[in-house]
Curated annotation (Swiss-Prot):
This is V-set and transmembrane domain-containing protein 5. InterPro entries: CD2/SLAM_rcpt, Ig-like_dom_sf, Ig-like_fold, NK_rcpt_2B4_Ig_dom. Residues 168-199 are cytoplasmic. One of its GO terms (cellular component) is membrane. The lineage of its organism: Eukaryota, Metazoa, Chordata, Craniata, Vertebrata. Residues 36-138 form the Ig-like C2-type domain. The chain crosses the membrane at residues 147-167. Pfam families: Receptor_2B4 (PF11465). It comes from Rattus norvegicus (Rat). GO terms for biological process: filopodium assembly; immune response; positive regulation of excitatory synapse assembly; protein homooligomerization; ventral spinal cord development. Glycans are attached at N43, N87, N101. The gene is Vstm5. It is found in: Cell membrane; Cell projection, Dendrite; Cell projection, Axon. Residues 169-185 are annotated as: Important for CDC42-dependent filopodia induction.
C-alpha cells in the first residue's frame, strides 16, 4: 500500500533555499573579521584600572594590535596573537594585561593616558577590522574635598557655640530659680513671723 500523497506541500528543503543558504555562508566567510566594541567612550579617574573591552569574530587566528593616539602622535601599546605571549611596548610594560578576546586592561591610569585607543584585528593581509575607544581620565578634585572639610569644621564650631550657649542659659535659669525660691522662702517666713507676732 502507498502512503497518501500531500498535495501543495513539499517535503524536505527546496533546492533554491539550500542554494541561498550556501551563498550566504560563503559571503559571510569572505567578509573576514567582525569587531564589536560595547563602549566607545570611557570616563575614569586617576589611579583606576580600566578595561578596554572588545570582541571579534574571525575564522583563523588573528593578529591583534592596540595603538594609543594622544595629541602628539601614534604610539603602539601591544601586539599579539591569541594563545601566544604579547609584545608589549616599553612605555606600557607592567601596566597592561591582554585577553584572548582582544580586550586589554590598563592599570593605574593617569591623565596622560587620556586619548583614543585604536584596535586593529588582522586575520590575513587585506582582511582586517579597526575600532576606536575614547578614554578620558580626570583628576580627583581635592579643592572640593577641602571645601567639604572646612564646611564640616564650621558646622562643628557652630554646634559647639550653640551647646555652650544652651549650657549658659540653663545655668542662668537655674540660678534665677534658686534666687526666686530663696526670696519666696524669706517672704513666707517673714509672713509667718508677722502672723505669730500679731497673735
Amino acid at each position: 500500500m502507498r502512503p497518501p500523497r500531500c498535495v501543495g506541500r513539499t517535503q524536505g528543503i527546496p533546492l533554491g533555499l539550500l542554494a541561498f543558504w550556501v551563498a550566504t555562508a560563503r559571503c559571510l566567510q569572505s567578509q573576514g573579521v567582525s569587531l564589536y566594541i560595547p563602549r566607545s567612550a570611557i570616563n575614569a579617574t586617576v589611579q583606576e584600572d580600566i578595561l578596554l573591552s572588545v570582541d571579534y569574530i574571525c575564522h583563523g587566528v588573528p593578529t591583534i594590535e592596540w595603538e594609543y593616539t594622544p595629541n602628539w602622535g601614534v604610539q603602539k601599546i601591544v601586539e599579539w596573537k591569541p594563545g601566544t605571549p604579547a609584545n608589549v611596548s616599553q612605555s606600557h610594560r607592567d601596566r597592561v594585561c591582554t585577553f584572548d578576546n582582544g580586550s586589554i586592561q590598563l592599570f593605574s591610569v593617569g591623565v596622560r593616558d587620556s586619548g583614543y585607543y585604536v584596535i586593529t584585528v588582522t586575520e590575513h593581509p587585506g582582511s582586517s577590522q579597526s575600532g576606536t575607544i575614547l578614554l578620558h581620565v580626570s583628576e580627583i578634585r581635592y579643592e572640593d574635598l577641602h571645601f567639604v572639610a572646612v564646611f564640616f569644621a564650621l558646622l562643628a564650631a557652630v554646634a559647639v557655640v550653640l551647646i555652650s550657649l544652651m549650657w549658659v542659659c540653663n545655668q542662668c535659669a537655674y540660678k534665677f530659680q534658686r534666687k526666686r525660691r530663696y526670696k519666696l522662702r524669706e517672704s513666707t517666713t517673714e509672713e509667718i513671723e508677722m502672723k505669730d507676732v500679731e497673735c
